[in-house]
Amino acid sequence: MEFLRLPQAMSRRGVNLLLALAPLATLARGSAALADSAPLTHAIAMHGQPALPPGFTHLPYADPKTPKGGRLVMGIQGTFDSLNPLVVLGVAPDAVPKYVQQSLLYRSADEPFTAYGLLASGVALDADRKELAFEIDERARFSDGRPVTAEDVIFTFEMLKAKGKPFHRSSLGRVTKVSAPSPRRVEFELGDGSNRELPLVIGAMPIFAKHATNAETFGETSFKPALGSGPYAVADVRPGESLLLKRRKDFWAEDHPLTRGLYNADEIRYDFYRDSNALFEAFKAGLYDVRIEGDPTRWMTGYDVPAVHDGRIRQETLHFDTPKGMTGLVFNTRRPIFADVRTREALGLLFDFEWVNRNLFHGVYRRAGSFFSDSDLSALGVPSDAREKGLLAAFPGAVREDILAGTWKPSETDGSGRDREQARRALELLMAAGYRLREGVLRNAKDEPFAFEITVTSRPQERLALNYAQSLSRLGIAVSVRLIDDVQYWRRLSAFDFDMIQWTWPASASPGNEQIGRWGSANAARNGALNYAGVKSPAVDAVLQALLGAREREDFVAAVRALDRLLISGFYVVPLYYLPDTWIALARGVVLAGRQPAYFLSNELLARLPAATPAN
C-alpha cells in the first residue's frame, strides 16, 4: 500500500503540494511504528550478522594513514544532460549521489550485503523486518551548515517514491507508513515484511535537503547540483563535457569510521568523450587516471605503448568473490518476431562463441550461461533440490527438464564459424516456430522475411553484432546493425524502442530488489525500467518474492537458483561471455589505498601519492 493515494485526476500542482505537506503530517503522527523491543544497533545485514562490531575504527580495507590531496580525473564515454541520475529523464553521471550526498547507511565492500550507520548513528529493525527506525547522527550537517533531520529523510522518501526511477517507485511503494516522532528519529512500517531487503534499500537512499530541493521540478533534467552532506561539492559544470568536484573543508564526517582512509583526493573531475576510441586514446595520452578495461583486444595489445613501458601507466588484474553477471544480446520479446521461445533458442544456437573468442578476443573470455556465474547461486551443472522444486511446483513446464536437472549448458560449436550441426538444430527450431527457408530467405507463414535490427553504442559492440549478423545470414535472416550515440541509445532503451541490444546485468553476492526491476512483470511496460527483455512470467514474479522473503541462506540460494533456471529456460538473451577477473589501468602515482575489498571495487579508495603529477 502506498503512503499517498492520489486521485487519477489530481493536477501536478496538487501532487507537489501533497509532497510538501506529507513530512509535516507524519511529524505530527508521533511514534507508534516501532516497538521499544527493537534496540538501536550500528548496522544491519541482509543475511547473517555484520562482520564489524560496534565501535569499529575504520573499514578493514581502508588505510586511515592514506595521504590526502591532489586531483583524480575520471574518463567516461558519452555525454550528460543532467546531474540527477535518480529520475527517468536525462543522462547523468553518478557523481552527485556518490560524492556530494550521503545515505543513512553505507554498504561495506568486504561483505555480501551489510550496511553500517553513516547519517544514521543507529538503526533498529525488528526480527520480522516489518518495522524500521533510524536515529540520525546529531553531528550530521548539509554543506550549508544546517542539520540533517528526519524531515529531510521523509521528504526524500516521498519524492523518490513519487518521481524517482521505477526501482525506487516500486521498492519504496511497499512502505505502508512513515513517521518522525522527533527531529532526529524516523520510523518506517514495511507491510508484511516479505521484502527483507527493503530496510537496506531505504538505508541507501541519497538524502536531499528539503529546504534546498524543489520537489516540483525533481523529475526534470537539471544541471543544478543537489545540496548534500557528503565530502565533496560541485565546483564546476560544463554541460556534456566535464564535471568538477572539490573537497569540502567543513565536511561533518571527516573522522567518521566509514570515511577514514576514503575520499582521498582534493578534487575529482569527470571528463566525457564521444566514443570508446577517443576515451582510450585520451587515457594513453595521460588525460585521465583510472580505466576499467573490458575489451580483451585492447588489454592484450592496446597497452603496448611508451606510457606503459616507462611506467606512466600500469596494468593490474583484480579478482573479487562476486558472481559474474550476464552479458548477452537481449531479445525485446515485446516484438512479435521474438515472442516464440523456440525462435529465441534457435538464434542463440547461431552464436559461435568458440570462433568469436579465439579470433576476436584472444581466447580470454569464458562462456556465459548463468546469470550468476562462478558462484553457488548459479544453477548451471547443479540439479534442483527439494527447495527449488517446491518453489516451482505451481508452475509446471516453466523450467525445462534438462535445465531442472542441471545438465543443460550453452551450445558449443566446432569453432569454424560455420558449424553445420548447430545450423541444422537452429533451423529445426525455427521451422517448429512456423518459419520456412525459401530461396535463401527465412520467411514466416505470411511470407514475411525474418529481419531485425541490433542497436549498438560502441565500435566493439558493432564488431560483435556484425559478426553475429553474418552468422544469421547463412540461414536467410537479415540483420541490420545501427550504431547510435549515448543520448539516443538511452532514450530508446527507456522507451523499449529496439529489437536487440547488447547488455550486461552485473551480479552481486546478495541479489535482491534490483532483480524485480530487471525481470518483474510490472516493469515490462514501465518506461525507464530495466526489464529490457520484456519478461512477463508469473513463475518469475513468484520466485522473486521468495528471494526477497528468504530468511535462511539455504532458502535464499534456492530462490536465486530457481530464478536462474527460469531465465535460462526463457532464452531471453543470447548468452555471450564474461571475464573472471577485473582489469584496471592506473596512471602513475594513483593507487587503491589500503587493500582490495573482497566483493567489489570501491572507488572511494583511490588516492594520488603526493609526488605524482596529476593528469591535465
PLM region spans:
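Extracellular/periplasmic solute-recognition and catalytic clefts
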Residues: K177-S179, A235-K246, D271-R335, R342-A346, ...
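Gly/Pro-rich hinge or "lid" segments in bacterial periplasmic/extracellular proteins
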Residues: T79, Q101-F113, E158, I202-L262, ...
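Ligand-site clamp/hinge motif
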Residues: D137, E220, A253-D304, E345, ...
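Aromatic-rich, solvent-exposed beta-strand/loop patch
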Residues: G117-S121, S143, V148, L172, ...
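N-terminal lobe/hinge region of extracytoplasmic solute-binding protein
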Residues: D36-D128, E135, E158, L227
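Detector for C-terminal structural segments
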Residues: V15, A22-P23, A38-L40, I76-G78, ...
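Aromatic- and charge-enriched surface segment that lines or borders ligand/interaction sites
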Residues: A62-P67, L89-V96, G122-P166, P181, ...
